[in-house]
Amino acid sequence: MNRPSRGAGAELAPGQIEYEFGIPIPGVIQPREAWTKTALKQMPAPGAIHWEALFGRVAPVAIDIGCGNGRFTLASALERPEWDHFAIDTLPAVVRYGTRRANQRGLANLRFAVIDGWRMLNDYCGDQSVDEIHIYPPQPYCDPKKVSRRMLTPDFLLLMHRRLKSQGRIFIQTDRPAYWEYIQDGVRR
């Protein structure tokens, strides 16, 4: 496979691999007829999302909170086609990147939406309705004036726990030791 040039407006052909800053984006570009539509352009009225209706099947569900450009979720959706993935971020621009990439790879087991983690779990996920929650990496807000903006508060950790199925798992990654200790303290409460 040829490495595509990434000039402005460069379009990738089927079979090509997309690169970002020299790093391959997971998956191979599919022919246009195999592309999917992964964007949830508007959230429904608040209430538990029926995952089976959204994805058209019964499958385990993983939510990626703060998905950014979707690199992790793309890889997970490709590696685990038997799982359904729901990726969210508050920034429309990065969600558009992820959506385009998932569409071009024909990933019917992935959806993207612009929404924050608290609202998603509180307003759209029922108790014990999710198998996995991924957060890579959460914004640490190290400035003492901004600490109150942290998402991973004890209340949010409790909300995640309530939304997980009995054998569900939470995955959190941070490169900030002090923030990791803060998260662990929240879990212990």
Regions found by a protein language model. Give the residues of each.
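S-adenosyl-L-methionine
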Residues: 1-63, 71-78, 100-127
